[in-house]
């Protein structure tokens, strides 16, 4: 996976005088699974459609497997796209839907039959070939849509929120199916979603987008454990990272809601009294038994989820905080607990949102 599959160089997109994609540079390794994730309107689908050739590039270049495809038609780019709407022909059987694109490309009948047979076997839809889309479940229709992409034998698969129309249980099973498909085929896959769970579970690398810009690129672990800024910290993770207003005291210490906490950072670019944000994920908080560095928190609501409780708390200065509580006696609403944070999981952000540690 060292060769480059897709390269985006200073990609820009404008609608009239409004620029919506602002000079994006990305190198996507061949055979990798990359997920574009971000809130609605961040530009992720627009970026995918530019790679597909369905949206004109205002400026910049797109390469696929070393070939400049910026001005090529979608059919000449070596890509296949899977949409959230399935885009199946209702009057055709599954077999005919799978074969349609190949017939339009004047592929020989024997080759069409072989590709349809192979794709239906991979997706386990052999028994559905004579049915029409209206006779299929949502998950089955999505498999057929993916099958239409597979038969084209593309260099790159593009997925635009393919699971958004499915219920929660089906989304889980289809995530597993898509991950298995990637392992079997080994093609480069670029996947767009607003669902961070899909991003974390499917991706080799995640690209977090906001307002047409890349906020961070990295492995799921890198993005989760070391978010580049407050936006990424708050977007990736469920529940989100606690981001608490704090004051820099110098010598690697901050004051959070009246309590002092140490953080592994030098005083570079910080002045005593500067406002900062102290970050801690819910699962990195624990009830402190006599530990010096702890924060009192009043429990407003305790959410019991079997092996885990989520404690929705309020600090002395009114800031909200969520803690994950896995062991020990039950904690009830109205009680006050002392919370601390794993030393190596404490994060500090500047007032303008940059990660400092």
Task: Enumerate the language-model features and the residues they cover.
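Helix-to-loop junction immediately C-terminal to a conserved catalytic motif
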Residues: 52
